[in-house]
């Protein structure tokens, strides 16, 4: 594995390399060895290293320290390596101890500030409650913790950070700020609370995918996005559990997009006004030496001043064409329900209007000094009269502004670089873009919306000259790319309110980013190595679109040669050589048509069968057959575990978690069944069984996972027989469930890497469901779920697994569902049999089985039970 990674890094300046490495194959160990062996070699001396994974708790930062230490390089580890966490997480963990240690050094005006006091009070309250939890109130306590943490993350920490940034502004450059934090007593505590200030001093970084996408806030320079920043140029980036990071990126893209509710007309006006009226600083339009060289070599290119002038002309033309000096207002009689009207735009516009109206037109009323918005049944005769024409023009101008801002910013950065004095800090593209946008005095929300879009368009950065032409070809390829990955989508909606009664607000949510686009940014600047058991599994729902990435990266999409493939195959064969010593049993668990017939397979006592038939009939209605089937299959797996004296640990994975008194999957009822099964098993002579279902059943849920998992491992290490109930989402990718081998337990060593921990003895797998967002005809979905559904729908249309007609029909249904149009949805168009959905289910099953394949020590018997629906159709 190390040889394959080294060959990729030495043969490419940038690109993407996917490594399919099975769970338990030592992939993390090999990555850490690679970093520790190569960081100080001549060929890697200019490279930074990144290790990225979904779960922050799975970052092997302390393990890397051991790899450095065994080579005598512990000092280098402290000097060069850092784990970058969210600022709020660090503050929650450190603020109290740092305040105690540095209380005499922290300036009094900081300690006495409202921002510091509010933050300290919240952190103290949170930590006190966590240290002294109230027994039996775990669920309400968890909700309280989450509320306080979100308040710190969203309000208290940003306010305190703003205070510190203002404090450090007395030092004019990032370098001087960093020097003060490192050396001046009254500022050293800042480095303890915000270790990210030292990012530029390090070379090896460990961070979650969330942090990588959302960006780095260092206090000493503008916040930047890792994937567009020069920090990753020529870097080696390892992405652990590669395919699963797509869902994490998608989640953050959706969350960020839904946070920016953009008033399209207002944003246009706020950009147009300074373009028309303001005299911009001369430095903004002074061409840099690099720009002048480009102008000499390209006859059609324009100066910065000409670009700014063209931008003003384009905005003014649109402003005049649509009489934008007047407000836009919905004519009340044209629609009864304005809250249920949307315009969706991907490759083209699609209207989702209430009632029988299919079009929306704009009528200019010069007498009333008003632009009237009217819903109509007929398409307007003049194209310019359509609202779609207005919105298209406005969005095109905003995109033009993004492009021109990026061009001006890059020129300004080059100008600053050319004028830089000795020992002066670099002026970054982030500095330049922020400076350009600041000239337009935009609202904070507009700036936060535009900044990453402008930076994303400027992420090419400084590259080696001999690769510039090749990269330009890639950029040209992207400019013709019309896929959802590159262009994204957006949707518009309309709001009328008494507080803005003279005009209607036309808002949009914009999703121009995609996980594939982020990955392309990375692979254009760095050497990206994606590692997972299912890294190259072909599913656009559970993995990146590999066909698209290959098409866009071309030669930079690296595939290992035959020698490396054979070497990895031999390594894998060595890992599984001892499996022949095991007895592996697989079985599908079925369901019979009525409760009584199923219960006869579970119990032998006719009175118990009758009693529990009645309980099931009371718990499950005829309409809820799926829940009953799911429940009874779990009970059948439970019985098989109880009656097998060779099994001590069992993992039962379902689509949802069992909860007490939850009719569809009642934990209390499961424990009742367990108690009765234990009674009959003991009567049948089975030994070493728990007293009751309460002792046998262990529910592992997301809330309080770490504490529960530690308790579970301790009990299993003592030899207790435990049936663990959990869900696919809870266990997830990368969760470690192995536990220390109990005393006097006979285990089988399957390879030379076995240590002191063993895997579970058995597993039950329910057929994965809800892999696509569920559009329930009886319940509205959230805004974020609807956007996720649209992304999934667009991904499938992109690959040709769903027709445009069916896909757009589903998207329209999703909008109706969001706005409360329930009871109309038809599932006939949902692509249940498409390859991506099929492979997504396979991926979930492979990752689930991987939870019991992490170590070299196994029970002599391994039992794998599956929902019979998996046998029939995989999903």
Regions found by a protein language model. Give the residues of each.
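Conserved strand-helix element at the start of the C-terminal RecA-like helicase core
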Residues: 47-62, 627, 634-669
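A substrate-engagement module of RecA-like helicase motors
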Residues: 54-203, 285, 289-350, 357-369, ...
């Amino acid at each position: 594995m190390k040889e394959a990674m080294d060959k990729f890094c030495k043969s490419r300046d940038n690109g993407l390399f996917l490594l399919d490495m099975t769970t338990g194959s030592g992939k993390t160990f090999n990555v850490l060895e690679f970093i520790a062996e190569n960081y100080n070699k001549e060929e890697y001396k200019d490279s930074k290293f990144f290790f990225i994974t979904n779960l922050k708790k799975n970052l092997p930062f302390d393990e890397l320290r051991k790899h450095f230490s065994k080579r005598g390089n512990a000092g280098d580890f402290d000097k060069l390596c850092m784990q970058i966490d969210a600022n709020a997480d660090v503050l929650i963990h450190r603020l109290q101890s740092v305040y105690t240690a540095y209380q005499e050094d922290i300036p009094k005006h900081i300690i006495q500030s409202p921002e510091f006091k509010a933050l300290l009070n919240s952190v103290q309250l949170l930590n006190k409650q966590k240290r002294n939890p109230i027994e039996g109130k775990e669920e309400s306590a968890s909700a309280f913790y989450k509320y306080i943490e979100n308040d710190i993350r969203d309000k208290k920490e940003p306010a305190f950070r703003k205070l510190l940034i203002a404090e450090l502004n007395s030092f004019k450059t990032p370098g001087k700020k960093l020097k003060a934090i490192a050396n001046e007593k009254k500022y050293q505590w800042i480095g303890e609370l915000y270790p990210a200030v030292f990012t530029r001093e390090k070379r090896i970084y460990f961070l979650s995918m969330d942090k990588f996408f959302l960006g780095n806030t260092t206090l000493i320079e503008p916040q930047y996005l890792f994937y567009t920043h020069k920090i990753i140029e020529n870097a080696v980036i390892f992405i652990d559990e590669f395919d699963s990071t797509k869902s994490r990126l998608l989640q953050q893209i959706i969350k960020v997009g839904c946070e920016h509710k953009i008033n399209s007309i207002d944003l246009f006006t706020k950009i147009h006004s300074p373009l028309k009226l303001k005299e911009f600083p001369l430095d903004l339009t002074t061409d840099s030496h690099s720009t002048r060289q480009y102008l000499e070599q390209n006859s059609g290119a324009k100066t910065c001043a000409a670009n700014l002038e063209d931008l003003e002309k384009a905005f003014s033309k649109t402003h005049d064409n649509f009489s934008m000096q007047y407000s836009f207002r919905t004519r009340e009689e044209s629609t009864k329900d304005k809250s249920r009207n949307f315009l969706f735009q991907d490759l083209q516009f699609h209207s989702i209007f209430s009632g029988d109206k299919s079009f929306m037109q704009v009528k200019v009323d010069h007498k009333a000094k008003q632009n009237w918005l009217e819903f109509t049944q007929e398409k307007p005769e003049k194209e310019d009269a359509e609202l779609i024409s207005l919105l298209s023009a406005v969005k095109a101008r905003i995109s033009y502004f993004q492009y021109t801002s990026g061009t001006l910013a890059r020129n300004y950065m080059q100008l600053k670089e050319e004028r830089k004095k000795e020992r002066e800090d670099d002026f970054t593209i982030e500095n330049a873009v922020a400076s350009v946008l600041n000239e337009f005095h935009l609202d904070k929300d507009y700036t936060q919306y535009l900044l990453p879009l402008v930076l994303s368009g400027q992420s090419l950065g400084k590259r080696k000259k001999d690769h510039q032409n090749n990269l330009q070809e890639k950029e040209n390829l992207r400019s013709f790319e019309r896929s959802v990955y590159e262009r994204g989508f957006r949707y518009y909606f309309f709001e009328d309110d008494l507080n803005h009664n003279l005009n209607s607000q036309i808002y949009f949510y914009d999703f121009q980013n995609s996980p594939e686009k982020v990955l392309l940014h990375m692979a254009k600047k760095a050497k990206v190595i994606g590692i997972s058991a299912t890294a190259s599994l072909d599913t656009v729902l559970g993995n990146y679109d590999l066909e698209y990435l290959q098409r866009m990266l071309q030669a930079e999409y690296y595939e290992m040669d035959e020698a490396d493939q054979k070497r990895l195959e031999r390594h894998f064969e060595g890992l599984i050589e001892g499996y022949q010593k095991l007895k592996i049993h697989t079985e599908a668990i079925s369901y019979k048509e009525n409760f009584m017939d199923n219960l006869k397979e579970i119990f032998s006592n006719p009175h118990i069968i009758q009693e529990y038939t009645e309980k099931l009939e009371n718990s499950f209605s005829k309409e809820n057959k799926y829940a009953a089937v799911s429940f009874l299959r779990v009970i059948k797996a439970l019985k098989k575990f109880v009656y097998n004296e060779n099994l001590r640990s069992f993992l039962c994975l379902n689509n949802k978690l069992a909860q007490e008194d939850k009719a569809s999957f009642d934990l209390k009822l499961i424990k009742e069944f367990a108690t009765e099964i234990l009674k009959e098993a003991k009567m049948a002579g089975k030994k070493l069984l728990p007293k009751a279902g309460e002792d046998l059943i262990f529910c592992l849920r997301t809330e309080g996972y770490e504490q529960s998992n530690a308790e579970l491992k301790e009990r299993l290490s003592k030899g207790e027989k435990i049936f663990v109930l959990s869900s696919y989402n809870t266990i997830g990718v990368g969760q470690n469930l192995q536990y220390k081998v109990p005393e006097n337990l006979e285990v089988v060593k399957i390879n030379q890497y076995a240590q002191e921990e063993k895997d579970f003895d058995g597993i039950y797998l329910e057929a994965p469901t809800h892999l696509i967002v569920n559009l329930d005809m009886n319940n509205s979905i959230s805004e974020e779920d609807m956007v996720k559904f649209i992304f999934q729908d667009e991904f499938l249309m992109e690959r040709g697994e769903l027709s445009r007609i069916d896909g757009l029909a589903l998207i329209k249904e999703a909008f109706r569902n969001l706005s409360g149009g329930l009871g109309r949805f038809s599932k006939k168009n949902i692509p249940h049999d498409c390859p991506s959905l099929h492979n997504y289910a396979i991926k979930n099953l492979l990752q689930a089985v991987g939870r019991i394949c992490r170590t070299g020590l196994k029970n002599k018997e391994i039992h794998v039970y599956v929902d019979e629906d998996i046998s029939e159709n995989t999903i």
